[in-house]
Structures are given as C-alpha cells and as structure tokens.
Amino acid sequence: MCGRYRRTTAAEELARRYHIPIPPQRDLPISWNIAPTQDVLAIRFNPESKQRTLDTLRWGLIPSWAKDPKIAYKTINARVETVDTAPSYRQAFMKRRCLIPVDGFYEWKKVLGGKIPYTISMKNNSPFVFAGLWEGWNDPSTDEWLRTCTIITGEPNGFVRGIHTRMPVILSEEHHNAWLCGEAGKEILVPYPADRMKAWPISARVNDPKNDDPEIVAPVELESVARQEDSPQLL
C-alpha cells in the first residue's frame, strides 16, 4: 500500500513541468509528510477545454453513492487487480482519472522486532506521478461537494520488493495523456523501472504526520538491516 508520501515541488513548478496552462485553484504548501484525508494536489483533464488542470482533492476516495464519508479511510489505495471492477472505483476508472505529483514516498520494511521506514524516490531527484482516480461526493448535511482521490497500487518492481509487497503505480510521461483521457486501460498500470529508483532507511519520525520537515528524509545508519540479503541498495 501507499499511506504516506511527500510533495516538495511547488505548484507553480508542477504546472510548468506537466504542461498545465490553467493556474491551480489553490496553491497548497509543500509537505514532507502527506497523510490520508489531507488535501493534496492532483492533475486532471478537462474534456471541454481539452486542457489539464492542477486541483486540490482530498486523499481518500468517497464514492458518489456513499452514505458515510468515513469510508475514505478505507479507500486511500485502489488495487490495480480490481480497480476496474470494485464498486468503489469502477466508475472513476472509466471516467475520472488523475495524476498525483510526488517527490518521494515512504514504505515500512518488516524486520525482526518491528518495521523500518524507507524513503523511495527517483535517482535523478525529479518529481514523478502516481496513477490515481477521483470522485465527487455531495455532503447531505451541508449540500457541499467534496472532491476526493485514491492512489492505485500494484505489484512492486524488483527494487521496491526488498522493502514492501506493494507499491504505488508510477506512470512514465509517455503514458500521462493516455491515462488522463481514458485512452489506455490497465495495460499501462505496471511496475515502474527499478533501475531508475533509489531508497534509504529513515527515522521513525515519519510515523507521525505532525513531523513535516526536511529532516524526515535524513538517512539513518542501519548496518544490521543493510546486511540482509533482501535489503535494497542504499544510495
């Protein structure tokens, strides 16, 4: 699963990088420790204007038919294996897709006696995007619309497998348009190339979303973990 990530590239730079002509609705501050139910930036496609937009969505998808918004705690991730058939996601998979800009994400490696958090990112330190879905939900108590999203997860590549049994689906740039416009299906939702990624162990401070600062990703020396055969390469 993916339950924590960071977005440290400013919205203005993301708009330039991902060819978004329309200014973001709201310039969310960067965050080193984004957690479920928080507001996040997402890239969507407007079929009328034929343009991309950079919008604010709530992480944790609430289906349009949901009675209780607390379902969002269970829908932060959509499994690629069932994303096109599961009741919570199948309509969004057909009509409401998004890209979620990221600079790195966190996964916890099970070790004897507990778990060790790792930060995972690109070797060239560039931002990248998760494949996501979004939905609109009308709050019956206020009659206000809330737009929410989920991150699609799948099998890990050979690199991330040394840390966790799942990983978010990362889309290469050549697939961005096809995903947003609905021109491609699950065939592009595959593990990202392992040789482009890096990871290292970090402090357990990341466990608390209140800890939101650059020190979150400071490397931690874990010689005993690094000696294990299935440990990822530390870069």
Regions found by a protein language model. Name each.
Residues 1-235:
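Short linear sequence motif anchored by a di-proline
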